[in-house]
Amino acid sequence: MAGKVILVGAGPGDPGLLTLKGRRALEQAEVVVYDRLVDEELLALIPADAERIDVGKNVGNHPVPQHEINQILLRKAQEGRRVVRLKGGDCFVFGRGGEELELLAANEIDFEVVPGVTSALAAPAYAGIPATHRNFCASVHIITGHRRRDEALTLDYEALVRLDGTLIFLMSVATFGEIAQELMAAGMASDFPCAIVENGTRPEQRKWLTTVGGAAACIAQGVRSPAIFVVGRVCGLSETMDWFDRRPLKGRRILVPRPRPDSHLLAELLSERGARVIELPAPSAEYLPVELPGAGVTLALTAAEAADALMTALENTGLDARALAGCRLCCVGKDAVHGLQKYGLRPDWSGEIDALEEEDCTLLCREDEAARFAALAPRAKVCPAWRVRMEQAAPIDLDSVDFVAFTTLSSVQAFAQATEGKRPTGVRAVCIGARTAAAARALGMDALQSAEMTLESMAARLEALCAGE
């Protein structure tokens, strides 16, 4: 039985612009065929057991020719698999989606199309440029500025000028100058407003507000693909309506190690504020056997992972939280409190280790911290409950990072491993907790603490640091 191909528009760059239907298609895919402009955050939605095929299409460089991509889709569908063809922007707006479906239709393969947000409208919107405005234009026109190799553009420039609407040129970095010259030759005033938006909707987005006559000078400043060329009176609204460039962390590159499940929330908080977030692979917790306590025993948890280790031990023995009814639950630090609350439990006591009542106390800690806690709480029974496994990370260019955000000691360890051999002296860090900040300083970093032990407080501290520069 033949499978199915779903063409999914991934949107223009911001992973948050993927549609709900597109997300569902990715999460259910057995094969995903994707292009260069697809964000890594979207690729993370692909099931671990799905086959990934990178066809790497780039402007002027197609490592996998279009006809071969068409054959890949056909072949995988004929194997009976659910195939997602993930394309930047919208599949049917200069995305060659129609060409890919023609072969599938000819071979009676079932297919579906999930439209995406096109860069033609999203990139101007992120630059504060509405594609239409009744006081300025009555139409918008999306035009390709791409030409086949060794061929000239065949556009009716006089007709475009007569339209007196907003003109949006896609795939035209190499032809911006030519297009501007031809528009002026067709009667457009040299001082007519236009804009260039590079990397639209991405944190590294740049824009140039200029005129048709000044476009060539902007291009000489090194405009790179992907970029769009917008010609129209609506470009004059950008200074008033540009919300994207006003975000407090715009253009900042912030490294976020991911040692615990809620670290992605920090990445989201920073992205919403305009930062380019670089995430390190998350160290994983390996839970160790925990001897379950009897009634009347005090259980002291030293981190959120201690709560996870305890609940895992209960589950492995066929028990649940009711088995803790006779125990006194204590939390050393707010992180442990949050970990316990995740399971609907509240501690009987929370505070610092030096105030813990140690009689009949079993203290759950990370394996490599057992000796430290044994010294701090000599009368407690110290039980190593988990160890941290570090994953191999890609090399990090510290010179390109503005800040590192550390949420736990484990995140500092992950960073140290990823930067092994490089001394991060002077690299700025914002940390949750005094111990985390101390560990960062031990690496030679310029580490500061957030006012509170929350992700929101950490984001606010980063904002304040950037505002004070």
Go through each PLM region and give its residues.
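Class I S-adenosyl-L-methionine
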Residues: 1-15, 20-117, 216, 221, ...
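Conserved beta-strand elements of the Class I
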Residues: 6, 30-33, 84, 141, ...
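Signature of uroporphyrinogen-III synthase
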Residues: 13, 65-69, 73-78, 177, ...
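Short, well-ordered beta-strand core segments
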Residues: 30-32, 52, 130, 167, ...
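General beta-strand structural signal in soluble alpha/beta enzymes
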Residues: 34-35, 54, 84-88, 111-116, ...
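Class I SAM-dependent methyltransferase SAM-binding "motif I" and its flanking Rossmann-like core
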Residues: 90-93, 97-163, 349-350, 354
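A short alpha->loop->secondary-structure connector
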Residues: 105-108, 131-133, 185-191, 318-321, ...
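Conserved anion/nucleotide-ligand pocket segment
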Residues: 150-195
